[in-house]
């Protein structure tokens, strides 16, 4: 075999021409100590706060404490694989999560990896978990209603798209139930729902997933789960990951409902991380920036201006109180950040009044502007009568000889309380709620026994649906005009004749 010298030289020339010199500079450091999910790293001189770090064995971390001679980082994975002396590389990227339509119907962890065994998720975009909230000019006031399907809420503490409404109460008072019912009620409303489970039991998350799947609600829902068995950094990240995914849809002009269940456990996870990072503790051993932790998260809920597509994120954070103590540190923080709160009482829950919402101390500071006219017409009277009833009930315990008017008011109050009761997973359409409130405040239930009120309500609504177009008219007009009211009165009178 003859090798010609010119052939060899042409190959060498070609290789020299194709050679591209590239220099990749990577910032790296060394692990000084590791333990409790925290690593102290020497080096990494140009690292950013919140930057993603690469440890050996594919384990990732996040830089949080940038100190004079070392970096404190939290480990987002199996910390037992990391040892002293390991090399750590800075990636130059902040922590981001995948966002896209493919996430709908899936259960993911705080890093955006699927944990439901349904295979990979293919997305076109990554969203940073920490991001500045929309500015003042970019927003518009809350004006569209977000119907929860729960009579007590839609009537007395209405929620609008772009609002932050806190759900607060002791454990086992039905906080999550309200959130899940709200997700169920968004079916067909073109609202994407994100349920963020922070520090929940795995069995609880599985139960919620099954219920939403059975009812066909996972088609528009994403579950972000950082369960109790996961490390504090992942529980800390979960709500930010959830809202980052929500922002992807909001920027496309869509409406999003996000539930944080619950922020008490989120604050505990952050406290654990902060203490391990040697940050100075404050009240109840929480770090000084625990208010900012929740304010920067909840400020990302917004109703964008029409120029920016008019999308919205509505946030329903949940807070668990201890023995009804609303004046504790975290509850007062979140109450002051949000636009109102729905207060659940164990006393009401145990007495069989469910959902156990105390309408007297529950408020919605901006939702009133978003209520439909028909609901405003009937619900304002309900709230007033309920407040008077609660007051009279206290007096009635002491005095036995009550006058006729007081007795009548108490009887009306009993019927209002009965109308407000609602089984779980049975959200009410807004037009049905309007009729329910209308019959109770206009005295159509005064001659019906309290024990038969709910049966009367159900059968009347079925009768109206089958024999009239009143419900459709309320839904279309969104108001109760004189003609419609006359029709409704007539139908109620006709139905009463056949009700036994």
UniProtKB/Swiss-Prot annotation:
<keyword id="KW-0472">Membrane</keyword>
<dbReference type="GO" id="GO:0015986">
    <property type="term" value="P:proton motive force-driven ATP synthesis"/>
</dbReference>
<dbReference type="InterPro" id="IPR027417">
    <property type="entry name" value="P-loop_NTPase"/>
</dbReference>
<feature type="binding site">
    <location>
        <begin position="169"/>
        <end position="176"/>
    </location>
    <ligand>
        <name>ATP</name>
    </ligand>
</feature>
<dbReference type="Pfam" id="PF00306">
    <property type="entry name" value="ATP-synt_ab_C"/>
</dbReference>
<keyword id="KW-0997">Cell inner membrane</keyword>
<keyword id="KW-0139">CF(1)</keyword>
<keyword id="KW-0547">Nucleotide-binding</keyword>
<dbReference type="InterPro" id="IPR005294">
    <property type="entry name" value="ATP_synth_F1_asu"/>
</dbReference>
<dbReference type="InterPro" id="IPR036121">
    <property type="entry name" value="ATPase_F1/V1/A1_a/bsu_N_sf"/>
</dbReference>
<comment type="subunit">
    <text>F-type ATPases have 2 components, CF(1) - the catalytic core - and CF(0) - the membrane proton channel. CF(1) has five subunits: alpha(3), beta(3), gamma(1), delta(1), epsilon(1). CF(0) has three main subunits: a(1), b(2) and c(9-12). The alpha and beta chains form an alternating ring which encloses part of the gamma chain. CF(1) is attached to CF(0) by a central stalk formed by the gamma and epsilon chains, while a peripheral stalk is formed by the delta and b chains.</text>
</comment>
<dbReference type="InterPro" id="IPR000194">
    <property type="entry name" value="ATPase_F1/V1/A1_a/bsu_nucl-bd"/>
</dbReference>
<keyword id="KW-0066">ATP synthesis</keyword>
<feature type="site" description="Required for activity">
    <location>
        <position position="362"/>
    </location>
</feature>
<keyword id="KW-0406">Ion transport</keyword>
<dbReference type="GO" id="GO:0046933">
    <property type="term" value="F:proton-transporting ATP synthase activity, rotational mechanism"/>
</dbReference>
<dbReference type="GO" id="GO:0045259">
    <property type="term" value="C:proton-transporting ATP synthase complex"/>
</dbReference>
<dbReference type="InterPro" id="IPR038376">
    <property type="entry name" value="ATP_synth_asu_C_sf"/>
</dbReference>
<dbReference type="Pfam" id="PF00006">
    <property type="entry name" value="ATP-synt_ab"/>
</dbReference>
<dbReference type="InterPro" id="IPR020003">
    <property type="entry name" value="ATPase_a/bsu_AS"/>
</dbReference>
<keyword id="KW-0375">Hydrogen ion transport</keyword>
<comment type="function">
    <text>Produces ATP from ADP in the presence of a proton gradient across the membrane. The alpha chain is a regulatory subunit.</text>
</comment>
<dbReference type="InterPro" id="IPR004100">
    <property type="entry name" value="ATPase_F1/V1/A1_a/bsu_N"/>
</dbReference>
<keyword id="KW-0813">Transport</keyword>
<dbReference type="InterPro" id="IPR000793">
    <property type="entry name" value="ATP_synth_asu_C"/>
</dbReference>
<keyword id="KW-0067">ATP-binding</keyword>
<comment type="similarity">
    <text>Belongs to the ATPase alpha/beta chains family.</text>
</comment>
<dbReference type="InterPro" id="IPR023366">
    <property type="entry name" value="ATP_synth_asu-like_sf"/>
</dbReference>
<dbReference type="GO" id="GO:0043531">
    <property type="term" value="F:ADP binding"/>
</dbReference>
<protein>
    <recommendedName>
        <fullName>ATP synthase subunit alpha</fullName>
        <ecNumber>7.1.2.2</ecNumber>
    </recommendedName>
</protein>
<dbReference type="GO" id="GO:0005886">
    <property type="term" value="C:plasma membrane"/>
</dbReference>
<keyword id="KW-1278">Translocase</keyword>
<dbReference type="GO" id="GO:0005524">
    <property type="term" value="F:ATP binding"/>
</dbReference>
<keyword id="KW-1003">Cell membrane</keyword>
<dbReference type="Pfam" id="PF02874">
    <property type="entry name" value="ATP-synt_ab_N"/>
</dbReference>
<dbReference type="InterPro" id="IPR033732">
    <property type="entry name" value="ATP_synth_F1_a_nt-bd_dom"/>
</dbReference>
């Amino acid at each position: 075999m003859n090798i010609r010298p010119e052939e060899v030289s042409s190959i060498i020339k070609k290789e020299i021409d194709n050679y591209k010199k590239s220099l990749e500079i990577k910032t790296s450091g060394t692990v000084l100590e590791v333990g409790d999910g925290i690593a102290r790293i020497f080096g990494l001189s140009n690292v950013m706060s919140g930057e993603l770090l690469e440890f050996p064995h594919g384990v990732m971390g996040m830089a949080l404490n940038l100190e004079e001679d070392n970096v404190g980082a939290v480990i987002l994975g199996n910390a037992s694989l990391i040892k002293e002396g390991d090399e750590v590389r800075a990636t130059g990227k902040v922590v981001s999560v995948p966002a896209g339509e493919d996430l709908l119907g899936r259960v993911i962890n705080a890093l955006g990896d699927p944990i439901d065994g349904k295979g990979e998720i293919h997305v076109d975009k990554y969203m940073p978990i920490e991001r500045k909230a929309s500015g003042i000019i970019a927003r518009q006031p809350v004006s569209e209603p977000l119907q929860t399907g729960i009579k007590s809420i839609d009537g007395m503490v209405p929620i609008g798209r772009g609002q932050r409404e806190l759900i607060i109460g002791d454990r086992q008072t039905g906080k999550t139930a309200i959130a899940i019912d709200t997700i169920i009620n968004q079916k067909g409303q073109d609202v994407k729902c994100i349920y963020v489970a922070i520090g929940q039991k795995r069995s609880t998350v599985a139960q919620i997933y099954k219920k939403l799947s059975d009812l066909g609600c996972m088609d528009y829902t994403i579950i972000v789960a950082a369960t109790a068995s996961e490390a504090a950094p992942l529980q800390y990240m979960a709500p930010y990951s959830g809202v980052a995914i929500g922002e992807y849809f909001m920027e496309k002009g869509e409406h999003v409902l996000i539930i944080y269940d619950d922020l008490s456990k989120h604050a505990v996870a952050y406290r654990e991380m902060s203490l391990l990072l040697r940050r100075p503790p404050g009240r109840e051993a929480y770090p000084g920036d625990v208010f900012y932790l929740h304010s920067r998260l909840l400020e990302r809920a917004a109703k964008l201006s029409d120029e920016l597509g008019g999308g919205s994120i509505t946030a329903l954070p949940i807070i668990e109180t201890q023995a009804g103590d609303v004046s504790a540190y975290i509850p007062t923080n979140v109450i002051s950040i949000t636009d109102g709160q729905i207060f659940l009482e164990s006393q009401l829950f145990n007495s069989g009044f469910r959902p156990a919402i105390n309408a007297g101390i529950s408020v919605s500071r901006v939702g009133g502007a978003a209520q439909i006219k028909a609901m405003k017409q009937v619900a304002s009277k309900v709230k007033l009568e309920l407040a008077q009833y609660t007051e009279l009930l206290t007096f009635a315990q002491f005095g036995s000889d009550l006058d006729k008017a007081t007795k009548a008011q108490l009887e009306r109050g009993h019927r209002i309380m009965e109308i407000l009761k609602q089984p779980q997973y049975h959200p009410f359409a807004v037009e049905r709620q309007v009729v329910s409130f209308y019959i109770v405040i206009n005295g159509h239930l005064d001659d019906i026994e309290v024990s038969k009120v709910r049966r009367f309500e159900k059968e009347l609504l079925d009768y109206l649906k089958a024999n009239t177009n009143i419900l459709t008219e309320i839904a279309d007009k969104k108001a109760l005009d004189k003609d419609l009211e006359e029709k409704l009165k007539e139908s109620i009178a006709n139905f009463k004749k056949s009700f036994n």
